[in-house]
Design a protein with these regions (language model features):
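Metal-dependent amide/peptide-bond hydrolase catalytic core
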Residues: 1-123
């Protein structure tokens, strides 16, 4: 959450005020650039719509998770309600042998398109 991120930022900066070695100084620069994705009521509505479509159209279930990483979704979530990670299934992300399961492309794209169509009626 943003509150947790701000708490950690304060704690890290407070460490700089505690000299461990006499005669030394620690300077911390920078700070929070991109915040976490917050689960707002609008985002929950989007999750509900997507989950229902996946269940009704494909007999599947949607599992929500928090990855703790940084994506384009973190950037857009600052301005608009954002769902992330709706693309094809992939394996070994960010490695030399990353791969995707192309069998998931059509159902995932269809679910996204149906969700987008329904959300235009809601928002």
């Amino acid at each position: 959450s943003v509150a947790e991120q701000e708490r950690l930022d304060r704690e890290i900066k407070a460490l700089a005020d505690k000299a461990v070695v006499a005669g030394t100084k620690v300077e911390i620069t920078g700070g929070i650039v991109t915040g976490p994705m917050e689960k707002t009521p609008q985002v929950q509505k989007m999750v509900d719509v997507y989950s229902r479509i996946v269940r009704d159209e494909f007999g599947g279930n949607v599992t929500e998770w928090v990855a703790g990483g940084l994506t384009d979704g973190n950037r857009t979530a600052k301005y608009i309600p954002t769902l992330d990670a709706l693309g094809v299934e992939n394996y070994d992300e960010h490695t030399d042998h990353e791969s995707v399961d192309l069998k998931t492309a059509v159902p995932r794209t269809t679910a996204f398109a149906l969700t987008l169509a329904e959300l235009t009626k809601i928002f």
